[in-house]
């Protein structure tokens, strides 16, 4: 027994004792580190993680490292270094680390969001981008799909005139239906129990990811029961059952003559691979139902909560800045009026609205810290050595709140994104990467930007979004998780009088 214990302790020491680095190499400055636990005891325990890592830059600089268990992580907090990691050396840092909770979420690194660099990730990312290309023109045009759901949302909100409501559920339904149409050409009804189940699953997953889970740091702890891991497994099982039911129905009716959604793209790729009618990168084994399910789950997971959260952040900031809201509505009235639906081309005339959206994405980035990257080869950042297998995290919060790049970064100032005349959009700083960049950038960036503009222009065209009668303004402190969520709040819905008059006039003419 004592021999076994000794072997066990020696094994732990080998795994977790800091390794000797190449003597000639120059590495990022590191937080203090202890055997077994690494830097865990030296990391701030209170407050929001992204803000804590930003504050550590005051002592350690814009690039520093720390150890958690046996893993070394490098934190990046400056746009030049971030762009080197994401763009200049994007392929070298295109890996993803194995993390216990995310392995469950991604079915052991399937899909695209959490998949490691390799043939599977490259194939599925390419197929997802091909699917988005389906929605550029015609009846499947993305703008048309978004406007359909925006109209349904607005029609529902019109029934809530004079009421103070939480926008979460109606917004989530609208955005879920857009994602569902892209994946399956399928939409949910408001009373559909599957819709509520999907929302509950997403909430459960984000709740788990918002917690610090020791198993993610010390994989050896998997031998012990974990309530968080069990909850994650339950959420993923429910999610997979719901999506698999839809997937199987779509497979029954699939024909290669009509490719109209993401699932069709994935199924056609599998047919081609099975028939040896595909390139060497399309291995049929990488296109199993489990692989397809993981990719579709990624699109749902990334596409719904992110957009819903950003729209709620925009509404919250407008409630805090009513004069800005009025100016945006004035520009909508002057440039669009009430007799047509806003279009993407209206960005050119609704520059204040677009600047407001961009400022919200800056001051409250939906992912304050990008999903960790991993060095797939020995590399460098600046003049510092980065060993193969090192995790690299870009602190987007630090980039977006750098005082040297942004004047008074904690103030909400949409004018940052406008020229001095207020008539042209500008890019005021390279320290702005709301959707990431490079090989691992957000595949749904175009979709998200269109959703944000079309939903907000439609809402402000039809409604006055007001502070509830109790005078309670939304908190601007977020709930950190994989997504920076706003705390629940209510907004009073009032149909605009000018909209009512325009509709009445149109019905009598």
From Swiss-Prot:
Transmembrane segments: none annotated. Pathway: Steroid hormone biosynthesis; Steroid biosynthesis; glucocorticoid biosynthesis. It is found in: Endoplasmic reticulum membrane; Microsome membrane. Heme binds at residue 442. InterPro entries: Cyt_P450 (IPR001128), Cyt_P450_CS (IPR017972), Cyt_P450_E_grp-I (IPR002401), Cyt_P450_sf (IPR036396). It catalyses: a C21-steroid + reduced [NADPH--hemoprotein reductase] + O2 = a 17alpha-hydroxy-C21-steroid + oxidized [NADPH--hemoprotein reductase] + H2O + H(+); progesterone + reduced [NADPH--hemoprotein reductase] + O2 = 17alpha-hydroxyprogesterone + oxidized [NADPH--hemoprotein reductase] + H2O + H(+); pregnenolone + reduced [NADPH--hemoprotein reductase] + O2 = 17alpha-hydroxypregnenolone + oxidized [NADPH--hemoprotein reductase] + H2O + H(+); 17alpha-hydroxyprogesterone + reduced [NADPH--hemoprotein reductase] + O2 = androst-4-ene-3,17-dione + acetate + oxidized [NADPH--hemoprotein reductase] + H2O + 2 H(+). GO terms for cellular component: endoplasmic reticulum membrane. Substrate binds at residue 202. One of its GO terms (biological process) is steroid metabolic process. It comes from the Eukaryota. Its EC number is 1.14.14.19, 1.14.14.32. Regulated predominantly by intracellular cAMP levels. The 17,20-lyase activity is stimulated by cytochrome b5, which acts as an allosteric effector increasing the Vmax of the lyase activity. Its cofactor is heme. It is an enzyme of class 1 (oxidoreductase). GO terms for molecular function: heme binding; iron ion binding; lyase activity; steroid 17-alpha-monooxygenase activity. Pfam families: p450. Keywords: Endoplasmic reticulum, Heme, Iron, Lipid metabolism, Lyase, Membrane, Metal-binding, Microsome, Monooxygenase, Oxidoreductase, Steroidogenesis. A cytochrome P450 monooxygenase involved in corticoid and androgen biosynthesis. Catalyzes 17-alpha hydroxylation of C21 steroids, which is common for both pathways. A second oxidative step, required only for androgen synthesis, involves an acyl-carbon cleavage. The 17-alpha hydroxy intermediates, as part of adrenal glucocorticoids biosynthesis pathway, are precursors of cortisol. This is Steroid 17-alpha-hydroxylase/17,20 lyase. It comes from Capra hircus.
């Amino acid at each position: 027994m004592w021999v076994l214990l000794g072997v066990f302790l020696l094994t732990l020491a080998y795994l977790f004792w800091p390794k000797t680095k190449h003597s000639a190499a120059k590495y990022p400055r590191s937080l203090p580190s202890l055997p077994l636990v690494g830097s865990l005891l030296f990391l701030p325990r209170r407050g929001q993680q992204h803000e804590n890592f930003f504050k550590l830059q005051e002592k350690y600089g814009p690039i520093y490292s720390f150890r958690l268990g046996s893993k070394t992580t490098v934190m990046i907090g400056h746009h030049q270094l971030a762009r080197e990691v994401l763009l200049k050396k994007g392929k070298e840092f295109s890996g993803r680390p194995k993390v216990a909770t995310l392995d469950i979420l991604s079915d052991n690194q399937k899909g695209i969001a959490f998949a490691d660099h390799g043939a599977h990730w490259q194939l599925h990312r390419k197929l997802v981008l091909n699917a988005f290309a389906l929605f550029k023109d015609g009846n499947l045009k993305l703008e048309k799909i978004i406007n359909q759901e925006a109209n349904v949302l607005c029609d529902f909100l019109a029934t809530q005139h004079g009421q103070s409501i939480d926008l979460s559920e109606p917004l989530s339904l609208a955005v879920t239906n857009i994602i569902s149409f892209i994946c399956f050409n399928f939409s949910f009804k408001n009373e559909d129990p599957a819709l509520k189940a999907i929302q509950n699953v997403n909430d459960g997953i984000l709740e788990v990811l918002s917690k610090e889970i020791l198993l993610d740091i010390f994989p050896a702890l998997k031998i012990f029961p974990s309530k968080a891991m069990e909850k994650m497994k339950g959420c993923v099982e429910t999610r997979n059952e719901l999506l698999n039911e839809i997937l199987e129905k779509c497979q029954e009716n699939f024909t290669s003559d009509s490719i109209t959604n993401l699932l069709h793209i994935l199924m056609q790729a599998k047919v081609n691979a099975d028939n040896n009618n595909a390139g060497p990168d399309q291995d049929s084994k990488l296109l199993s139902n489990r692989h397809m399910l993981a990719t579709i789950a990624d699109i749902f997971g990334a596409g719904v909560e992110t957009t819903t959260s950003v729209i709620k952040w925009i509404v919250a900031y407008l409630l805090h800045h009513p004069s800005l809201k009025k100016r945006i509505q004035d520009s909508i009235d002057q440039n669009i009026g009430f007799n047509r639906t806003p279009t993407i081309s209206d960005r050119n005339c609704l520059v204040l609205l677009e600047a407001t959206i961009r400022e919200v994405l800056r001051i409250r980035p939906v992912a304050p810290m990008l999903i960790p990257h991993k060095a797939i080869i020995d590399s460098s950042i600046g003049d510092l050595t980065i060993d193969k297998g090192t995790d690299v995290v870009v602190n987007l919060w630090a980039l977006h709140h750098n005082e040297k790049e942004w004047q008074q970064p904690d103030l909400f100032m949409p004018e940052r994104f406008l020229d001095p005349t207020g008539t042209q959009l500008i890019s005021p700083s390279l320290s702005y990467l709301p959707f990431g960049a490079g090989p691992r950038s957000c595949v749904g960036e175009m979709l998200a930007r269109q959703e944000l503009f079309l939903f907000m222009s439609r809402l402000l065209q039809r409604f006055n979004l007001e502070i509830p009668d109790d005078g309670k303004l939304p908190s601007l402190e977020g709930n950190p998780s994989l997504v920076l969520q706003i705390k629940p709040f209510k907004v009073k819905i009032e149909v605009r009088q000018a909209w009512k008059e325009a509709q009445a006039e149109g019905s009598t003419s």
